[in-house]
From Swiss-Prot:
GO biological process, one term: lysine biosynthetic process via diaminopimelate
Location of N6-(pyridoxal phosphate)lysine modifications: K64
One Pfam family linked to the record: Orn_DAP_Arg_deC
PANTHER family: DIAMINOPIMELATE DECARBOXYLASE, GROUP IV DECARBOXYLASE
Homology family: Belongs to the Orn/Lys/Arg decarboxylase class-II family. LysA subfamily.
Protein's name according to its UniProt entry: Diaminopimelate decarboxylase
Amino acid sequence: MFPDIEVNDKGHLLIGGADAVELADEYGTPLYVIDEMRIRENYRRLYRAFSGEYSRFQVFYACKANTNLAVMRILEEEGSGIDAVSPGEIYTALMAGFDPDRILYTGNNVRDDELQFALDSGVRINVDSRSQLLRLSEIAPEGLRISFRVNPLVGAGHHEHCITGGEMSKFGVMEREAPEVYRMAMDLGFEPVGIHAHIGSGILDPEPFMLAVETLMDIAGRVHEATGVEFEFIDFGGGLGIPYTPEEEPLDIDEFASKITGLFKDKLSEYGLGRPMMCLEPGRYIVGDASYLLTRVNTIKESYRKFAGVDAGFNTLLRPAMYGSYHHILVAERPLDEPSEKMDVAGNVCESGDLFARDRQLPEINEGDVLAIMNAGAYSFSMSSQYNSRPRPAEVLVREGKVDVVRERETFSDLLRGQNVPARLLKR
C-alpha cells in the first residue's frame, strides 16, 4: 500500500501522471493532489478480496475520511455505499448521486431535527442508543427498518482517540443489552434488520478485528435466538489501516478477507443466521494513500535546531499535531534523494506544536522547494480549519496526467462568509 515513487525525465515526482512541481507552480500551494486511479485500485482490491470469499458483500465507504464530491462520485461509480455520520454527510452523499438506500446513517448524540432529516432523506438509520430509539419512535412511520450499533467491548486503533469500542467508548448499545434493545424496537413498531459495530481506526493487526467479528457474531446469535430477528446485513465497520512509514507492512488483504469471511461463515452456520449481507466501512484504506499535500518551503532557519518552514500548517493537515502521526515527506524536485541531515519541518500556524516532522532525517531542502507530504488522503482536508484566519487549500484530481480542480482555493472573503456586524457597532 505504500505508493511507489514515480519520476519523470526531469527527475520530478509524478502523481497520477502529473508533475508535482508543475502542479504546485500552476495551482499554488498548499495543494492537495488526489490520484483517481489509486482510489479505484484500492477499492477494487478490497472488494475482490472479500466478494471472492463471500458473494453477498457490500462496502459502505466511511466518507468522514474524505468528503470531496469528486472522490465520492468515483466510489459511487465503483458500486460503494456510504457510511454517513452526520446530516451534512448524508446531504453530500445525495449530492454525489448515491441512492438513499445505499447510505447508512450512524450518528451519535443526535438531535431530533437530525433524525427527522435522516427520515426525510430516506436513508438507512443505524441506531446508537435507547434514547435515540425512543425519540425516533415518536416521528418514524410504523415498520421502519433499522439497525443498531453495538459496542462489542473490543477496541483497537493507531491512537487512543481513534479507539471506538470498549468500556471507555461513547458509541453504541452495550452488548449485554442488545437482545433487550432489539425486543424494545420491535415492541415500538420497528423492523430491526441489521447489526453493526466499529472498534477503531488505523488497524494493521488483524487479530483485534477477528475478535470483534467473533464477538459481534455471538451477539447477533443471541439477539436472533432471543427475538427471532432475521438479519439482512451484519456490518463490521471500518478501521483497516495503511502503512504510514516505509517500514510498516500493509495488510495482506486477501489473507485478511479469507480469515474474516471464514469466521463469519462459521458463525452464520453456528447460529442459523442464513446468508445476510456482509458489510465493511473502510475509509482510510481506500483514500489514505491516494493523495499528497504539496507545500512550498519559504524559510530555512538554523537556530538551536534546523527548521524547514513551509506554507501549510496544522490547519491544513492536523494529524501530525493531533495524533503525533508520521507522514513521509519527499522533495518533489528530487524525490529519490537519500536523507542527508536531520531537521524539523514546521508549519506556518502560530503554535509551537505545528510540526509535520520532528528530528527527521531528510534530503537537502532549499527555500523554494516543494515538499510532498504522502498519505494525505484520509482525515486531512476533512479535518482542516481556518485557524489563524488562513483560507483552506485547493484540491485537484489527477488521472493519467489530466488535472481537474475539484475544490477551489478559499479566499479571504470566505473567512468572513456568514458573519455580520451589528449596526450599533458600525462607524457613523
